[in-house]
Amino acid sequence: MRSRSNSGVRLDGYARLVQQTILCHQNPVTGLLPASYDQKDAWVRDNVYSILAVWGLGLAYRKNADRDEDKAKAYELEQSVVKLMRGLLHCMIRQVDKVESFKYSQSTKDSLHAKYNTKTCATVVGDDQWGHLQLDATSVYLLFLAQMTASGLHIIHSLDEVNFIQNLVFYIEAAYKTADFGIWERGDKTNQGISELNASSVGMAKAALEALDELDLFGVKGGPQSVIHVLADEVQHCQSILNSLLPRASTSKEVDASLLSVVSFPAFAVEDSQLVELTKQEIITKLQGRYGCCRFLRDGYKTPKEDPNRLYYEPAELKLFENIECEWPLFWTYFILDGVFSGNAEQVQEYKEALEAVLIKGKNGVPLLPELYSVPPDRVDEEYQNPHTVDRVPMGKLPHMWGQSLYILGSLMAEGFLAPGEIDPLNRRFSTVPKPDVVVQVSILAETEEIKTILKDKGIYVETIAEVYPIRVQPARILSHIYSSLGCNNRMKLSGRPYRHMGVLGTSKLYDIRKTIFTFTPQFIDQQQFYLALDNKMIVEMLRTDLSYLCSRWRMTGQPTITFPISHSMLDEDGTSLNSSILAALRKMQDGYFGGARVQTGKLSEFLTTSCCTHLSFMDPGPEGKLYSEDYDDNYDYLESGNWMNDYDSTSHARCGDEVARYLDHLLAHTAPHPKLAPTSQKGGLDRFQAAVQTTCDLMSLVTKAKELHVQNVHMYLPTKLFQASRPSFNLLDSPHPRQENQVPSVRVEIHLPRDQSGEVDFKALVLQLKETSSLQEQADILYMLYTMKGPDWNTELYNERSATVRELLTELYGKVGEIRHWGLIRYISGILRKKVEALDEACTDLLSHQKHLTVGLPPEPREKTISAPLPYEALTQLIDEASEGDMSISILTQEIMVYLAMYMRTQPGLFAEMFRLRIGLIIQVMATELAHSLRCSAEEATEGLMNLSPSAMKNLLHHILSGKEFGVERSVRPTDSNVSPAISIHEIGAVGATKTERTGIMQLKSEIKQVEFRRLSISAESQSPGTSMTPSSGSFPSAYDQQSSKDSRQGQWQRRRRLDGALNRVPVGFYQKVWKVLQKCHGLSVEGFVLPSSTTREMTPGEIKFSVHVESVLNRVPQPEYRQLLVEAILVLTMLADIEIHSIGSIIAVEKIVHIANDLFLQEQKTLGADDTMLAKDPASGICTLLYDSAPSGRFGTMTYLSKAAATYVQEFLPHSICAMQ
């Protein structure tokens, strides 16, 4: 008989430990583990972590088996793991209706429960009686389901369960924008049931999504139908938000020890090694004690000062928990595992020794890990005075199974029984390893042979869309529809993935669908519902952004491939040459670099072997040959009747998968290019006619299916020109001189409404006026009046032969102004028609997810409305309309700016540093004011000029303002594109002699306002007559420069800088932490009557985002941005006084009073130097001298000089005598 090896003996010891501390509690029926002897409920998160030691021990036995009994032991342990994981699966699958609802609502009431009955798998508390929404719990289950399946365990048994897991993927993929209650189930640390965005949830969701992608849940016994699919763009959304949050944990927690599970085992969710180390150091520095780590600062759980009879805390009560937070040995187990995975033996040894010292010996000397260590009630004051000196006592669960399991797992790995690769078979531990450089492959395709010839003349050789066959080219919208059928299961009433826009990572792959290769064009080319895609420069900008994004975020096997089609809209007016912006972009891509990205252009067929290709197995046909039963009626009567137009109800989400399947079937069956060789025989007579009818039916049906899936430019994707939808024309008169029309944009338009004998508006006469006018602006204004007075569906009877509703006429007019790129009218009509801004709600969510609150409309409240949580599209647009006070153009411009802000947030998040609230109304006002200041024009003219900027010019102007650089605006004297307005050149100060490269992009903005001076149309010098109606195009932003005379270019520089910083809410680095210190030495800060009380420091810590937002809410009561910035400077001076070793600097400090004292000191000194009243004119709104606004912060006459004197004067009774003497 073979003797037992030493390793076998050690494993037997661990097996006894696991049995005595974990498995003895496992329910024999459900496999679930109760939280403790007292708490019989089974928490999802605790169960998953608690079973890891069992899983690890099973792997160790499998690896180190000395005899058959060891193999049997390994199997027994592994089946205990499977039993628990399936028990949790049964708990969740019983709530399948909640999974379905949550995909669309993201509501806390629709979330899966966090805990279940250990014996029955049933729920134990109501939906609203617990903080159930804990995305990290669902995510950690999915993560280890993937890891365990990859290690060889067979947990999922049926395709129904596969579909349920696929829907759990949809459940967690929106974690980056979903506020939940977090790993500690409390949400906001005030414990008042307020959900918030948690880094621990976002990070764990990212890890789970990456682990499950392309994983076969049946393991080696699986097939195409058991594979899980994850969209890469959702993963990258999570990564972006996670990076913006860390090292913070949430809005209310500046650091949290739970982040160890995100930056290290098990998630390994962060790719930036420096951010990983920074986060770990923050935890060690701020949370580590003698017995473990606190969960987060001011955590009251089980402290002597916590009232066990109250569920929630009072906000000011949190200060009582400072320095006496309970310490959890659990987190030292994470440090041990982190040391093992990183190969840091010294760290492993250090924390093992520390952990051994806090373990409690149970019966027979079994080491038990307590839940936490607390300060004894009678020694609280002593701990307050000298933190980390009082000996603490163990409290809570014993053992804490979560911690006990990780302790055993860490010991197994530290002793070499398990290698990192065995517990991490999906290799997540390599997340911080540098990735190879990405080369973006770009395939340029021509829509037609004519465009191909034009490109060839320019030295650019491409294929047409028809020539790339058998590869199919489709718009991104189709891919979104295809994915909407993923995870569908009628028996479980699961609808699949909610329809969402497809990101650039998704469209940069090739797809194998039914043994055919598909490529999808980028989403921004498919944005025909909104006007951004009408601007070729904007298309180039979005392409540049996507290429840069791909280079930094691509993590898949193979290279990304972008299919970039060139359509007729990308040609010049005459259609004989390519737009200069598009041509320049194509040449740069051919050179190998564009937008900082390495690019390789070539044929699509050449990229097949190097591209990332995904097999969409869920679209594969079933046994009958097709995924869905289909019945095409191809007879002539069917075509003649026109019923084919109503075959599919595109509004029904439930049938969306059927529609896509039918569309793809028809596409594959009927759009193959016909051979060019002459046929050997030719049908004649009736046969030939029936064949033609058959082809016509096929193509018409295919076009219809495409249109019902909202595919624009159908002819661009189908190899036929037989059927192109023609928009009905109502023959509104074109302008006889379109260029002159374009050159004279209307700033203020008056419509003289015709009246009948009773004094009512004569609508027939108004329609006749519409028919006779050739002015596009006047046509738009008349249609707006008809829209508001009669409604969009009113039939104007413009022509007797057919209906001509107001909506139809506006749509036709929108097409006309779109062709000539009249951006002011495009925005105006878009606002009237309420055209949907593509991904507006997603843009808003992206900004909010980066902890940026938004406001729309101009201050003060209630006109300025704050957006602090994601809103549905309809609610968001309604809020913007209300804040815009009915001005359609301002409303649509607000939405446009929100989209641009989200673009910059995604590519250049550094632009938004130290900005916690983006005030879009003020940003637009500053844009208009800058135009007014630099062009010496009125506010109304500047507003009209702003409205006439092309989208690309608007986006670049926004970048200048966000970047904080000094820039100038001037009219260009050079003629520009005849289509559009004169150029307004926007450049950085001092960049006159810049190189050609520097003059492009950010350094030189060429926009398209008209080539003549701004002037008004139809503005009579007389007062407005009673029959005159003003249209919303007359709206403008107030400007301080309406009557400003020309002045030296340097004059006004500092006032402009303060206005920009104030509008953007930009503050100095560390400003909020300094305000926190000031509040500790006074009773509060008063700004325009609103008080920021010192009690906030008892609730919030200096580094909390929540505190920063609280300070912002007080400062934002000030409507004038430059005045707000002076108040910020005054508070900065107070922070310097707060550093002095004195107990108090006053009671409630009125900050605006300090500013006015400084203003008086400034005026006195300037008068003694001979300044007259004209030079010392005051701003009527704030009473501050405009010259003080324009003073530099430093220097003898700097604002800080006067503010320092004023602050010392204001608080002098609290200051030491020596300080006062310095005045």
Swiss-Prot record:
Muscle specific. Isoform 1 is predominant in vastus lateralis muscle. Isoform 2 predominates slightly in heart, and it predominates clearly in the other tissues tested. The modification Phosphoserine is found at S629, S729, S735, S758, S972, S981, S985, S1007, S1018, S1020, S1023, S1113. The lineage of its organism: Eukaryota, Metazoa, Chordata, Craniata, Vertebrata. Belongs to the phosphorylase b kinase regulatory chain family. It comes from Homo sapiens. This is Phosphorylase b kinase regulatory subunit alpha, skeletal muscle isoform. The keyword Lipoprotein applies. Pathway: Glycan biosynthesis; glycogen metabolism. Residues 1023-1039 have a biased composition (Low complexity). The keyword Nucleotidyltransferase does not apply. GO terms for molecular function: calmodulin binding; phosphorylase kinase activity. It is a lipid-anchor. Phosphorylase b kinase catalyzes the phosphorylation of serine in certain substrates, including troponin I. The alpha chain may bind calmodulin.
